[in-house]
């Protein structure tokens, strides 16, 4: 799977994230792709002209093994075009909040996080969402739920790596189309059968996408794409 970002300049944004994460940028049929792996979520950047409407519903958490590494990551990101971002964090909090060149928020987490230990550089995709949607995505992806407490949930590949987490209530009001979305690729089996499976789990079919696949919404109303392999 990959996380898709709408971008005014997909190549520029992919180049930024490729250098921050140490990944090669590939030209995908839909945009610029930073391929993932069995343990790291991929990132896909596509052309989109939608301006941000309200608070961001997803953001990335990058991990650090030492304070020096955290400082190097922050310095490198700033040099590549990131900017400090004030989201109300307190001065004594250890993580650093930045915005990428197109304003997408991300955090560079301080060392010592037990929750993100062993998760790799892209440690977490933090999402706004309910407990139910966390369980939906666990079943949809075939990933176990590794955190389920106080309405917060997280899932993780059986191979480990990046966690996808949902913060529970109160939820941020939705406004327009999400600029970050999940992109799933069907590598085997029938597209129609997979759509029926996801619908049985709680997804809603939104539309067909010519030469690509279909767009659905999860139980919280977040759009995602199921593409033919």
Predicted segments with their positions:
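Short, small/polar residue-rich loop motifs at catalytic or cofactor-binding pockets
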Residues: 91-93, 209-211
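Glyoxalase I/VOC metalloenzyme domain signal
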Residues: 1-29, 34-86, 99-150, 155-207, ...
């Amino acid at each position: 799977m990959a996380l898709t970002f709408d971008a005014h300049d997909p190549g520029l944004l992919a180049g930024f994230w490729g250098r921050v994460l140490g990944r090669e940028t590939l030209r995908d049929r839909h945009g610029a792709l930073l391929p993932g792996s069995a343990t790291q979520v991929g990132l896909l950047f596509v052309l989109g002209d939608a301006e941000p409407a309200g608070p961001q519903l997803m953001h990335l958490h990058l991990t650090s093994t030492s304070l020096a590494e955290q400082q190097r990551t922050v310095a490198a990101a700033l040099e590549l075009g990131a900017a400090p971002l004030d989201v109300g964090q307190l001065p004594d909090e250890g993580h650093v909040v930045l915005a990428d060149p197109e304003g997408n928020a991300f955090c560079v987490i301080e060392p010592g996080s037990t929750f993100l230990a062993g998760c790799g550089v892209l440690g977490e995709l933090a999402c706004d969402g309910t407990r139910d949607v966390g369980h939906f995505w666990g079943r949809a992806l075939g990933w176990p739920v590794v955190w389920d407490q106080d309405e917060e949930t997280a899932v993780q590949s059986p191979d480990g790596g990046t966690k996808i987490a949902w913060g529970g209530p109160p939820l941020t009001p939705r406004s327009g189309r999400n600029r970050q979305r999940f992109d799933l690729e069907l590598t085997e089996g029938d597209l129609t059968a997979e759509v029926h499976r996801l619908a049985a789990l709680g997804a809603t079919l939104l539309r067909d996408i010519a030469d690509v696949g279909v767009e659905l919404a999860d139980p919280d109303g977040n759009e995602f794409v199921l593409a033919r392999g």
